[in-house]
Amino acid sequence: MNIYLDVDGVLLNHDGTLANHADEFLAAMVNSGHPVHWLTTRCRDGDSSAVVAVLSRLVQPSTVELLTSIKPTSWAASKLEAIDLRSPFIWFDDQPLQFEIEELQECGLLDRWVKVDLLSEPDQLSALRMFGEL
C-alpha cells in the first residue's frame, strides 16, 4: 500500500505551525513498511528539499531523518497524476480539488482519501497513526 501525504493542512496548521502529533504520525507512516510519498504543492517536481527544509525546522530532531526517507512525487495539474490508482493506497489531504474528488468517486476509490481537518479536530493525527498499522 502506498501512503501519500499532503503537508499544508495535514502536517502543518493553517498558521504554519506544526500540527499536534505530527512527529508521531510521521514516525508511524515511515515505520509502517509501506512506501510513503509527499503529495503536496511544496513538492510537485520530484524534489522534496523544500518540504524537508520547512518541516525540519519544526519537528523533533529524531523526526528529521524520517523526512528524507519520504519519496517526492511529480505532478502538474492534479495530485492524482502522482498516485498509482491501480495499486492500494491511502491519501491524507485536507482539501483535494473538486475534480480530484470526483475522479476518485468515479473510480470507486473515494474511500482511499482520508480527510484531515485540523481546524475542527486539532488532535486528529493521533488517531490517524493507526493507518500505519494497515
What do the PLM-derived regions correspond to, one by one?
Residues 1-77:
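Alpha-helical substrate-recognition element adjacent to the catalytic core
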